[in-house]
Amino acid sequence: LNESEIKKKFNDKPFKERVIKLASAKAAVISAKNPESYVIGADQMCVCGEDILDKAGNFENAVKILSMLSGKTHQQYSGVCVFYNGESLWSYADQASLTMHKLSQEEIISYIKTDEPFQCSGCYKFESHGVNLFLKVYLIVQVKWHHLLLLY
């Protein structure tokens, strides 16, 4: 599965739609091989301004990405879908806005050595030590017809 090609193909679509397309592409591949199984596909996309930030892949790129995000607000788009027998049954996407503390180079390097977030969207593991990088997290979750506001 070539994520870059999918991102290019849907480049004119809103970010929430793009992240669903990525999650669905992953689920569709697995569902085709396992037609009698329910398959959950998920993906995340980190966006700063209009730029999609790819996974760092290595230490040097991780420093660049976290230096760019330092002191700024960016968005994480999360998409999830359920497939069965090669068909999409359900999909959902949401957006969180995250404001990172202003980090020194030493703090960035120390964090990267601690969590090694090279394959993570935004180059941080929020569920681990990455949560400490943030000043503010803002998320609106739609639950049926109601909105739930979550602030961290």
Which functions belong to the PLM regions below?
Residues 4-6, 45-47, 87-94, 135-138:
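Acidic/polar active-site rim loop that often engages polyanionic ligands
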Residues 37-38, 74-75, 79-81:
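Structural motif
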Residues 1-38, 51, 103-106:
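N-terminal polybasic phosphate/anion-binding patch
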Residues 63-67, 78-96:
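Anionic-ligand binding region
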Residues 18, 44-74, 100-102:
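Active-site-adjacent loop/tail segments of enzyme domains
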Residues 1-3, 79-87, 119-132:
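Mobile beta-alpha loop/short-helix "lid" or hinge segments that flank ligand
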Residues 23, 43, 62, 80, ...:
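Residue-level signal for inorganic ion chemistry
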Residues 72, 95-152:
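GST superfamily/GST-like fold recognition
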